Amino acid sequence: MTQELSVTRFDRRQFLALTGAALSVAPFHALASHVVGSEQRATDGYGPLQPVRDDTTGLLLLHLPAGFRYLSFGWTGDPLSDGSLTPGSHDGMAAFSTSGSRIRLVRNHELRRGTAFAARPMYDANGGGGTTTIEFDTVTGSVVDVWASLAGTAVNCAGGPTPWNSWLTCEETVAGPGGDNDYHHPHGYIFEVPVDGTASAKPIRSMGRFVHEAVAVDPATGIVYETEDQAASGFFRFLPDETSNLAAGGRLEMLALTDKPQADTRTGQTTNVWHPVGWVPIDDPDPDEIAADSLYSQGIEAGGATFARLEGAWYGDGRIYVVSTNGGEAQMGQVWEYDPTGERVRLIFESPGIDVLDMPDNICVSPRGGLLLCEDGQSNCFVRGLTVDGTIFPFVRNNIVLAGEKNGFEGDFRTREFAGATFSPDGRWLFLNAQSPGITFAVTGPWSDGPL
């Protein structure tokens, strides 16, 4: 594990500004006794939530604090700029600077088998997933352009932005040709989508074939941290041979707790306790014979640590934050903080029950240094804020009930997950997705009145 890397040092502030992450407020690692522990604290955040009408449709789709407004766009079935239709199952997403008042969003579509929704760029004609890219004007609050940027992939769940202005989209499956599948090619990879165009549609095999969820890139080193969404999962990192050129290859490793080899972190954990970590090699990141736990098993045999369903991941001010969707004694979720400089990890939050936090999934770091947690739980779904002083509060509530008013959708979608939370680089807009029926929202309001 001593192989040298060719590293380009990216400016941390440029990357934080690029993706709308925290710049001015003390991050979680500035906390000491204030980290949420046995006393789980909840506050009003921006105040009580109330139903708010969508600026686009006039429907009461979201509950928000007073003073906030939103608009919807990019519904499943809406036309793309070329006349084809927007695919569904909106999931992970990130916002990027372009020029002037315009930003671009790269958005995942977590679809499985089926005809690819675009002919180019396409990996597998029978892969239903991929990404679309949206150009949005932050002054006018309107969509300028939208196009398919990757097609023919499968189960594109989350991913993450890079400091070199691209989106890494992750396949949450290891399915391939044969059996019950009609895929032409193997799946379970990471693909790179440039913000200024379309993807090459070539998987980055050295980053591993497993049940991927999300990634977070450390701009100081170019190392890519990867989460795995399995009941027993590992936390991986990819050390590229050439920073910003991931396709050139690299090596994959899995986190281990050096004070407890083969540790199981799913339960029995204490908040605010640092654990020293090391990394064990994954010798075969793309095995010929694949099972969902093939790479995890390699890591465990070498002493790696087990987590419960690692999903969302995001970089913020020198730290990597990841969530375990059903970790903890209540199986309602954990939030972990990894310190790459100190090579240590700690639990900073564990949900005591469904009313506090119900199975977090996608996450992002807010402009003021907190975390936004998108729920994918068992009840009415929320987006919740977790602040730097260790408090949690509801910020968005799903109120989507439709009777055919838009694109023919009917049904009660209030228990369906939120995903893709990401702030505009100027911090004025929060973008997020309702996975079903497939809607993207842009939320704005008096951010300075509260902790996000």
Model segments located where?
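Signature of short aromatic-glycine-proline-rich micro-motifs recurring in repeat-based ectodomains
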Residues: 85-94, 300-312, 359-362, 408-425
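N-terminal export leaders
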Residues: 10-28
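C-terminal segment of N-terminal export signals and the immediately downstream linker at the start
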Residues: 9, 29-64
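Beta-propeller domains
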Residues: 272-346
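Conserved blade-ending motifs and adjacent loop-strand segments that build the rim/top face
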Residues: 349-361, 391-422
